[in-house]
Amino acid sequence: MILGYVNNTYFNQAPNFSSNFNFQFQKRLTKEDIYFIVPDYLIPDDCLQIHKLYDNCMSGNFVVMQNKPIQYNSDIEIIEHYTDELAEVALSRFSLIMQAKFSKIFKSEINDESINQLVSEIYNGAPFVKMSPMFNADDDIIDLTSNSVIPALTEMKREYQNKISELSNYLGINSLAVDKESGVSDEEAKSNRGFTTSNSNIYLKGREPITFLSKRYGLDIKPYYDDETTSKISMVDTLFKDESSDING
């Protein structure tokens, strides 16, 4: 049962993450260190942390699950990196859209108001415009062909999806960036299963307290990430919601 959470007990609150971890546990956690999320009647009378550093897991009644250890990049660092890359893709896409809007250049003399009036009338939807006989549309209007903008926008969309997929995969979340009109086969959907599972398993050090719990009570608990089970649970939850809607409707 999850009792609650411990707030920053193992960390020194240093700005630099690499020097933030406290390797010397000065205090064994007790009931006063836990922010409980369970009802009061489920809170034990006494709480003492189980850990091999103190008495080789011979006493205590709760463990603390930790985030990834510092020899890996933290989730925040990964998210910040991909946030910068996604912002770059979004900015490039905005730049392409602006390029598509500016498709014509009108040549004229400096301070020539007639050409300004022409541009204003054209973009305001005037059915016809009056110009001087000296105006030559072939010579005075330069067409900036933007045929490459649409394919570039498609590539920007695909790159954005790829970055989102990379971020999800690095966090151990199964994600597929394939964009196909014909749909995605089951084999394609599972093609990155090994990569996401390996990234999920970098949390194994954070699961080490489970071994303390097993040693304390003589159990054999082996946690692992099961992507298929996670998907099935999501499907069952969706099905349950649909059935509830049908009954209530």
UniProtKB/Swiss-Prot annotation:
* One GO-annotated biological process of the protein: symbiont genome ejection through host cell envelope, short tail mechanism
One short Pfam name that applies is: Phage_connector
- Supply the alphabetized keyword list: Capsid protein, Late protein, RNA-binding, Viral capsid assembly, Viral genome ejection through host cell envelope, Viral genome packaging, Viral penetration into host cytoplasm, Viral release from host cell, Viral short tail ejection system, Virion, Virus entry into host cell
Q: Got any disulfides in this one, which pairs?
A: none
Question: Where's it found, cell-wise?
Answer: Virion
Molecular function (Gene Ontology), one example? RNA binding
Keyword RNA-binding applies: yes
Where does the record locate the signal sequence feature? none
Question: Where is it mainly found?
Answer: virion
Q: Name one GO cellular component term.
A: viral capsid
Q: Extract the coiled-coil ranges from the record.
A: none
Recorded family membership: Belongs to the phi29likevirus portal protein family.
Task of the protein: Forms the portal vertex of the capsid. This portal plays critical roles in head assembly, genome packaging, neck/tail attachment, and genome ejection. The portal protein multimerizes as a single ring-shaped homododecamer arranged around a central channel. Binds to the 6 packaging RNA molecules (pRNA) forming a double-ring structure which in turn binds to the ATPase gp16 hexamer, forming the active DNA-translocating motor. This complex is essential for the specificity of packaging from the left DNA end.
Self-association and partners: Homododecamer. Interacts with the pRNA.
What's this protein's name? Portal protein
Organism of origin: Staphylococcus phage 44AHJD
